[in-house]
């Protein structure tokens, strides 16, 4: 056993200078690529981190849709179900009078707290809830894809099939693809009833974003049962289920509703010619996002908007 002095005198570490040069080049590239990154904490290599790191946005279509409602009178409140590390709230939440975030994953919740403080200040008034909403009060196991913190889901009571849950994150071998945590779930109807009764004034107009990987129906039904008739909302939510019954969804709400799918119209060319796309882009071609009203026979998979 060496003593401390012997260890100090014997210490030596060598490295490959070629590897050092490669690393320095990568660091320069990283600094260049991330010069417009969002001022938030994200996890390197995670599926939800690429856009915030590279150009400071997350889901541009969703953020712009929320902004469109916020700047046109729907700015009284924002409810963010499945807030994760706070990307939607932090990048689209400025301008709402009240913000309520819900995130059951305790690991992610700590990052959410930090990102909210970075964005809204230490003395922020954003309400952060370290629990999710479902069909009752319980402790459930959260399944977390190792390469996508944003894809975590509750298997118990999930409305998605196992194939959908695997496919949405491109999981081929589930045996080593996930981590697991026990999380707190509270009854959707009870909690939302209290929220709309005591914390959101009557007559308010706001935005609700739901990204809870197969638990959306529980929250949507609870909103329908508890939303005051004087309030109006734009509900943005994700759907991976091709058999999603939006007619049943509309029946939850005892009032007029309209359902849309957010669709991307990118710049295209014949035969997917990349050079032609570059030329068109240099000449000013622009891609677009638009809302298409959903009919009975249309594919409901994608980012949806329910106007109530």
Regions found by a protein language model. Name each.
Residues 1-125, 165-182, 189, 193-204, ...:
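S-adenosyl-L-methionine
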Residues 61, 87, 106-107, 149, ...:
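Short alpha-helical
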Residues 82, 209-213:
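Conserved S-adenosyl-L-methionine
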Residues 89, 96-97, 206-207, 216-243, ...:
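A short alpha/beta connector and helix-capping loop motif
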Residues 130-131, 182-185, 209:
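Conserved residues in the N-terminal Rossmann fold of short-chain dehydrogenase/reductase
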Residues 133-135, 188, 212, 239:
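Hydrophobic pocket-lining residues within nucleotide cofactor-binding pockets
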Residues 139-147, 156:
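Polar, low-complexity loop segments and adjacent catalytic/binding residues used for recognizing
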Residues 244-257, 261-266:
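C-terminal substrate-binding/active-site "lid" region of AdoMet-derived donor-dependent transferases
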